[in-house]
């Protein structure tokens, strides 16, 4: 069926529901399933505010989707220009790119279907459809679902409210709550542009690394990426452990600091400061594990390790005793400079 005809039929069905009085929960769920099933492409912008740390983190997000599994998610954090990142999914896999540092990692992952993604249309609809106990209400402009979340590595954010625009059935607002029912994450969407025609290389790694998409120096870079002094950071979430040893090393690329914690749950944190930026685009590194959000950035998690980059520093957390949730908590607690 022609794409335009499909869109017209979907819009007609939405108007029919609206014209027959207040829509039921099952009516709206059925329409949501049909709408996302017929999507060929979309593009929109969103703002995501994360309130889980000591200070709120605000992201500007540019979202693009092309049927049936191509995604590009641009995440710009004004508080960390070098940390602005891109999540790509294409025929070659899932990638996390940090254009300012010429870094790219490839994951063997079923992202985004492996967990809730509060900024992705398909993921939000999947959460609604998969929760038989979801609560539903209708406001003047929105259909509102209150559902369980599916965060594999963070059980502290169990509930979300998703607001869908009544006219288009696209998401307008997402509120994610912690166990005390405080808003921990809030995502606000701009109107969606449907049926977008993208350039052939729009979802390719090299094109996104060298496009200057964040107005940052990417591609061929010479000299230092930062003039700031290397500051060793210490976690405040210690999980019953204490700092037992600090080791510092000089490397050709810069400095390395290794923090060893011993106690109830032992772990090690490595911090690598690279004084010289990479000089050319290189092939993506294959990263074990799955991509996860940790505060201001996206990291790679396995059962016994968590790696991430922030403010020009590469971090590696390793432990045989910490759970995945605990590793994320330790990593997030390193967001501020702390004394030993």
State each model region's role:
Residues 56-60, 81-84, 155-160, 172, ...:
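Short, surface-exposed coil-to-beta transition loops
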Residues 64-118, 182-188:
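An acidic-aromatic
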Residues 2, 15-70, 132-133, 290-314, ...:
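N-terminal leader/targeting segments and the immediate start of mature chains
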Residues 140-209:
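Gly/Pro-enriched, hydrophobic low-complexity segments
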Residues 73, 174-176, 317:
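Beta-strand-dense domains in secreted/periplasmic systems and polymorphic toxin scaffolds
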Residues 1-8:
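Bacterial N-terminal signal peptides that target proteins for export
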Residues 90-154, 158:
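Flexible, processing/modification-adjacent segments and terminal tails
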């Amino acid at each position: 069926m022609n794409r335009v005809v499909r869109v017209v039929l979907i819009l007609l069905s939405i108007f029919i529901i609206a014209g027959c009085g207040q829509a039921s929960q099952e009516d709206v769920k059925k329409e949501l399933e049909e709408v996302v099933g017929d999507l060929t492409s979309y593009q929109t912008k969103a703002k995501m505010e994360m309130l889980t740390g000591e200070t709120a983190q605000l992201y500007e997000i540019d979202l693009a989707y092309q049927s049936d599994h191509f995604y590009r998610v641009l995440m710009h954090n004004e508080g960390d220009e070098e940390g602005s990142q891109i999540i790509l999914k294409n025929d070659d896999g899932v990638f996390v790119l940090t254009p300012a540092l010429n870094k790219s990692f490839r994951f063997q992952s079923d992202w985004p279907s492996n967990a809730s993604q509060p900024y992705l249309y398909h993921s939000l609809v999947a959460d609604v459809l998969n929760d038989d106990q979801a609560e539903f209400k209708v406001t003047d402009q929105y259909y509102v679902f209150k559902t369980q979340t599916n965060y594999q590595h963070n059980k502290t954010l169990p509930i979300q409210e998703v607001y869908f625009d009544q006219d288009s059935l696209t998401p307008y607002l997402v509120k994610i709550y912690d166990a005390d029912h405080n808003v921990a994450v809030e995502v606000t969407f701009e109107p969606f542009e449907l049926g977008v025609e993208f350039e052939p290389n729009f979802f390719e790694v090299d094109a996104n690394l060298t496009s200057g998409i964040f107005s940052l120096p990417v591609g061929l870079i010479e000299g230092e990426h930062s003039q700031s002094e290397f500051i060793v950071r210490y976690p405040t979430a210690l999980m019953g452990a204490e700092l037992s040893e600090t080791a510092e090393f000089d490397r050709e690329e810069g400095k390395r600091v290794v923090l060893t914690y011993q106690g109830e749950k032992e772990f090690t944190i490595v911090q690598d400061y690279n004084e010289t930026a990479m000089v050319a685009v290189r092939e993506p590194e294959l990263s074990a594990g799955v991509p996860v959000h940790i505060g201001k950035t996206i990291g790679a998690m396995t059962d016994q390790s968590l790696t991430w980059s922030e403010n020009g520093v590469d971090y590696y957390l390793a432990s045989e005793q910490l759970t995945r949730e605990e590793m994320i908590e330790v990593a997030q607690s390193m967001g501020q400079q702390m004394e030993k």
